[in-house]
Swiss-Prot record:
DNA repair is among the record's keywords: no
Biased composition (Basic residues): 132-145
Lineage: Archaea, Methanobacteriati, Methanobacteriota, Stenosarchaea group, Halobacteria
GO MF annotations, alphabetized: rRNA binding; structural constituent of ribosome
Region (Disordered): 132-177
Domain of life: Archaea
Family affiliation: Belongs to the universal ribosomal protein uS13 family.
Protein name: Small ribosomal subunit protein uS13
Organism (species): Haloarcula marismortui (strain ATCC 43049 / DSM 3752 / JCM 8966 / VKM B-1809) (Halobacterium marismortui)
Length: 177
């Protein structure tokens, strides 16, 4: 900042803010460009904190860098790592191991993940597997206890206030007699 132009520092900050891409599109999802690479990638369905950190590391990107300020070629590297995530990590870290029809292990993201999960559940329902039957009935699927938790119906309890009001009315009626 100089004496001649008191706003010189503010113009540089304004230009720096204008260089940012506020939305970065990966697949069918718009990611927030004002967040760090790691935080922005977690907005994508199927990518958690650990996966986002691995993607940033494999793409040679600082995970704390602002996503919208990255160059196009760096963003392309990140997109490529997201698409090929299953190749970079062990099989146990992917979200869709051993596909029923193809036997492949993939890592689904975005709408593909939701579609794949829905198809798997519908297939289990159709073949009447144990998990499919539990899904059909709307019960817990993964072995949780159901005796006391997960009840969906309304409670059939005692309304203490109503009883006290009735008792007060009865007592008042007896006093009047």
């Amino acid at each position: 900042m100089s004496a001649e132009d008191p706003n010189a520092g503010e113009d540089a900050d304004a230009e720096e803010e204008e260089d940012i891409r506020y939305f970065v599109r990966i697949g069918q999802t718009d990611l927030d460009g004002t967040k760090s690479v790691e935080r922005a990638l977690t907005e994508l369905n199927g990518i958690g904190h650990r996966a986002a950190r691995i993607i940033a590391q494999k793409a040679d990107v600082d995970r704390r860098a602002v996503f919208g300020k990255l160059d196009d070629d760096v963003i392309e590297r990140v997109v490529e790592r997201v698409e090929n995530f299953a190749d970079d990590v062990p099989e146990w870290m992917t979200n869709h191991q051993k596909d029923y029809f193809t036997g492949e292990t993939t890592h689904e993201t975005g709408n593909d993940l939701q579609l794949t999960r829905r198809q798997d559940i519908n297939r289990m329902k159709m073949i009447d597997s144990y998990r499919g039957v539990r899904h059909k009935r709307g019960q817990k699927v993964r072995g949780q206890r159901t005796k006391s938790t997960g009840r969906t119906e309304g409670t059939i309890g005692v309304n203490v206030e109503a009883i006290k009001e009735e008792q007060a009315e009865d007592a008042a009626a007896e006093d009047d007699e």
